[in-house]
Amino acid sequence: MSQSMYSYPAMTANVGDMAGYTGTTQSLGADIASERTAPSRACQGDLGMSHQDWQAQWNQAMEALARAYRRCRRALRQIGVLERPVGDSSDCGTIRVGSFRGRWLDPRHAGPATAADAGD
């Protein structure tokens, strides 16, 4: 049988030391907690908001931009300026630029297209 010696004064001293360590640990925990919140307060940047707030605002703005883009494309399609290619299921389309009433000029021809154009 092993010999165990219990000394009341030694045990009370040990309890006193542990109480001191508990206080030190709690104060360190409070310091760590304050250090963790300091960067989030300091990282407000030029805009005065946290990164998470800025990212949420950015995402909302991008969603609003995408909705406006889709509304614009829908409106252009309704008035006939934007045509959806046949068989295309994407949101891409071709812009139709009004009817051309004049004559197409041949870039290889330096002079007027007809004799009537020579007088212009």
From Swiss-Prot:
Keywords recorded for this protein, A-Z: Secreted
GO cellular component, one term: extracellular region
Subcellular location field: Secreted
Domain of life (superkingdom): Bacteria
Major localization listed first in the record, in broad terms: secreted
Gene3D superfamilies, per database record: ESAT-6-like
Family membership: Belongs to the WXG100 family. ESAT-6 subfamily.
Protein name: ESAT-6-like protein EsxQ
Organism this protein belongs to: Mycobacterium bovis (strain ATCC BAA-935 / AF2122/97)
